[in-house]
Amino acid sequence: MSSMISKDTALAGAWIVALASSLAVLYIGEVLGQAPCNLCWFQRAFMFPLAVVLGLGLWWQDYGVGRYGVALALGGAAIALWHLGLYTGILPERIQPCTATGPSCTDDNQVFLGLPIPLLSLIAFGLIAILSIFSLKAQRT
C-alpha cells in the first residue's frame, strides 16, 4: 500500500490529523469548557508536538521526521489505549490515575460527537503512526 501513497501525501496526512486533533482538544477544553483528565493531559503532551514536528518536516521536506512521528504517535497511542481500557471497564478502576478532585477519566463527559474521546485519540495516533511509516517507506513524487 505504501507504493500507492507518496511521501508528501503521507506526511501531509499525518500532519493534518495531528493538527486537527490538537485543534479539537483545544476546542473541547477552551470553547466547551471541559477540563481534561490526567490521561488526556498526557495524550496532549504527545499530540501537540506532533502537529509542530510533522508540520516543520513537511515545510522543510524532511521526510526523516516520520521516525519522530512514529515514536510520538506510539507513545500517545499507548496512553490512549490505557485510557480506553479504563473508560470501557476492561481495566479495573483501582489503577485509575485520575484524582478525586479533578475530572474523571471514565465519566460521560469523555464523549465527543457520540464517540469516547479515548477512542478518537487512539484512532488519531494510529493514523499518524501509519502515515508516518508510509512517509518513511514510500517513493518520493
Whereabouts are the PLM-identified features?
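Secretory/periplasmic and organellar redox-cofactor proteins
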Residues: 1-39, 46-141
